[in-house]
Structures are given as structure tokens and as C-alpha cells.
Amino acid sequence: MKKVTAMLFSMAVGLNAVSMAAKAKASEEQETDVLLIGGGIMSATLGTYLRELEPEWSMTMLERLEGVAQESSNGWNNAGTGHSALMELNYTPQNADGSISIEKAVAINEAFQISRQFWAHQVERGVLRTPRSFINTVPHMSFVWGEDNVNFLRARYAALQQSSLFRGMRYSEDHAQIKEWAPLVMEGRDPQQKVAATRTEIGTDVNYGEITRQLIASLQKKSNFSLQLSSEVRALKRNDDNTWTVTVADLKNGTAQNIRAKFVFIGAGGAALKLLQESGIPEAKDYAGFPVGGQFLVSENPDVVNHHLAKVYGKASVGAPPMSVPHIDTRVLDGKRVVLFGPFATFSTKFLKNGSLWDLMSSTTTSNVMPMMHVGLDNFDLVKYLVSQVMLSEEDRFEALKEYYPQAKKEDWRLWQAGQRVQIIKRDADKGGVLRLGTEVVSDQQGTIAALLGASPGASTAAPIMLDLLEKVFGDRVSSPQWQATLKAIVPSYGRKLNGDVAATERELQYTSEVLGLKYDKPQAADSTPKPQLKPQPVQKEVADIAL
């Protein structure tokens, strides 16, 4: 019966798309150089790059909702972290010999420096206005307890001192010092508990929804840019000249139109996979998606909010995905401070918060069903974790909060459903299928269509991700003197690494901090810490990571 239902649903969707395409033929076809599908931060960032690189190119942006930045880019639908690996312990895994690997942390931090430079440049151009409306200084802290975790944090701190990107980080195992940094976390805690923390003053809280709205508002000032809201893509067809005809339904009046585009970017968040499949390019057959949602506890009580100014990340429990690490965060949303704690994983078959319960089923094909099954069979610990999260009670969530805020009161907190994160599942020759953390740009060989899949680190690295897309799709243009000069004006460090160059790191941090109104003091000498005891780690099955 389920197979029959699925078949009928697929037929209905297919017939509807054919009908839409037929109706659209009757109307005049719109032409555009660049079609941006999705009104989130990725499309907004790519459009902003292209506006500077090729100001004469026409652009059309499509958004199925009634406003932009309503899904994962919305400030309430994500944690608002400027991910730079200052506190996120999952970016510094422990090796078998007990040493700490910092390569991933360095890469994440380098990427965020590109985002800071991109935003600073847009502020100088007047594209982004009032930096405090979208980015604020909020110190980033790691906080752990227990002897093994304290030893891990010692080793992590020592390892990160090798990088110029992490200079200025502080370390302490002293209760009084940590209480000064994060009083809410320490008050009411057992004074005999062994704890440790790191703190970096230059951490940030970012409202990605506000950035998105401001970027798009600036794009709209040009006559060769068009934003179409309540517009849903129903079909994509490659033409003989390698342009694309995209059939778009107006969700308000039921009409349809065809848009002919030279280049199509699918930046539709969770919906990107289905649209990539609709394009029919062979590269899409390697991918599947699995949706995971997230919930946060939220407090707007001034007694709580005014007592906490930090993002405090802990360490994931044994057997849990590294990215599932709980954190208690200062956020600045809609002009006021709030505190969030989470995330707690949730499950829905929707690929978007405003999506359809059919999303997961309709994206499952004969080419990706086996990789999905392999991932499920190979990652039973992950499945068990997700089930345990879905089964959490109100009391369970509150007890988790008290590990980070011992004196928390239930009446100060409410539960908030954040956005959906579609995890990448990719075909693998050896394993059949693997779960991939991170984002991935998928494009055709001709460079006429590209999609962004994945969820983490996501919005905080929109600027470097879109740089990667430009290099992948417009390689010849990127190598031209004109584009090189423009890209280096937008991102001064473009084409080189900051890590290892103390002077360059300080110069870029000083520049972006001044323009964005962020706190920055030149780093002082590193804190002296007990020498970490590097212990060989027991061999354990690696738990696949997911983004919440």
C-alpha cells in the first residue's frame, strides 16, 4: 500500500509539473543571466559577489515564502555562532596517541576570517548598515568538567597556541576566574568539581537573517535585479545551448512562468537536493539527504540575560555525534539580548521548517536508496542517539540545562523549534554510502548550474563557500586580472593563508574589528597551564557527525 501511495504521489507531482510547464509556455519567457533559487544567506552572498564582479549581469532571485531569510538563515532558526573553532571542541579531535589535531580548527577559523572581511567590505560600501544590527562581540568559551575532559582541554589549548589565529585565548582551572568569565555557569556548582575553561574575547554572535535582508535590499536597488517572492520552482530543463528553462509557480495567483537563465544557483537550503535532482544532471545521483531538526530552550528573563555574556560550549557525551555538543549562548536578536541553550535533536521528514512531510520520500530514488540504507546500518549509534533525543521529556531537557546553569529555574525558559538541517549522504565506492558533515558545492561539468548541499558550518562561512563556488563554476573569469583585483578588494587575504603570519592575522583582525564595531585588543602572552598528560586513546568506533 505504501509503495502504491508513493507512486501515485510521484505521478501527481510529475503531472503537475508538466501542466505548469505547459501553462508557462503560453506566457512570455523571462530571460536572466543568473537565477538564484532561494532567498537565504547563500544566494544573497553569491549575488553580492557577482554584483561587484559583473555589475551588468542581470539577476533574478526566487523565494517560495512571502519574505527572504525565513528558513535556516532566520536568526531564531540557528545558533547565531560566528564559527571560528575558538570554542567548538569537535573541530579539534584527539588522536590515538592522545595528541590534539588542529588542522580542521585552523581551516574553520581561516574561513570565518574571510566572512569577516567580506562583511567589513560591504559595510564600507554601504551595502551592510549598522554593524551592531547583525554582529556583536560575545566571548567564546569552552567549558568542561571531569579529569579526562580537563586534560583534553589543556592539551587543546596548548596545541592551538601553535597557530597565529588563536593567540589571545585564555585558559583557567580556577573556579573564581571562570565565575568571573561566566557567573551563570559557575554559581551553585560543587566547589570541589574539577573544571576547566578557555575564553577568547573576539568571539561573535551573528544574526544571519539580518545580513541576508540587508544584502538583498541592496541588490534590489539595481534595475537589473529582480526578487520574486511566493515563487516556487516546479521544473528545470537544460536547453540545447546549455541555458536553463526554469518553470516557476506563483503561489498566490496560481499562474506560472518560464525563466531562461545562463547560470542557475540552487541555494534553497533543505530544498536544494530535490531541485538538484529535478535538474537531471548526473552529478546529482551521488547524493541523498536526511533531515534533522533542532530545539533550543530560550530565556528572555532580564535576571538571566544580564547575568551571562558569552557563548559557552561543552564537550559531547561518549557515543553522541561531536557536533551535538550542548552550549549556552548569549544571542542578540531583534535588537535585544536573549539566552539560548541546546540544541536538542528532533526528527521530521520535512527538509524545510516550512516544507512538506513528503520531502524525504520524494527525494529517495533508485540511485540513492542504497547509500541511505548503508548509512543507517553503519551508524547504529547515531540512530540510537537520535531516538534518545526525540524521546527526551521536559524534565530531561531541564536537567541537561542544569549541567551548564546549576541554578536554572523552569519558569524562566521556553522551548523553541529551530530550523531543519538536511545531512548529506554521498555514495561511496567502499562503504556504499557515507554521512558527510559540512557543505558541498555540486555542479555540472559545463558550469551552468550549481547547488549547495549540507548544513555545517553553514551561514558563518557563506563568503568562503561562495568563493569556492566562483572558482569551481567561473574558473576562467576568476583567474582574469579584473576578477582577481575585485576579489582581493572584497577579501584582502584572498589567495593566501593567515595562519602562521602573526602580523597579517593581527592586521586583518584589527581592520575587520574597527569596521564591524567589534572588540579587539592585541593578544598578550599565553597563560601558563599544567602540562597535559597525553594518554593513548582506547580504540572506539567513530560516531558519524551531524549538524543540528
UniProtKB/Swiss-Prot annotation:
Residues 530-541 have a biased composition (Low complexity). Pathway: Carbohydrate metabolism; tricarboxylic acid cycle; oxaloacetate from (S)-malate (quinone route): step 1/1. Disulfide bonds: none annotated. One of its GO terms (biological process) is tricarboxylic acid cycle. One of its GO terms (molecular function) is 2-hydroxyglutarate dehydrogenase activity. Its EC number is 1.1.5.4. Residues 521-548 are annotated as: Disordered. Keywords: FAD, Flavoprotein, Oxidoreductase, Tricarboxylic acid cycle. It catalyses: (S)-malate + a quinone = a quinol + oxaloacetate. Coiled coil: none annotated. It comes from the Bacteria. This is Probable malate:quinone oxidoreductase. It comes from Shigella boydii serotype 18 (strain CDC 3083-94 / BS512). The gene is mqo.
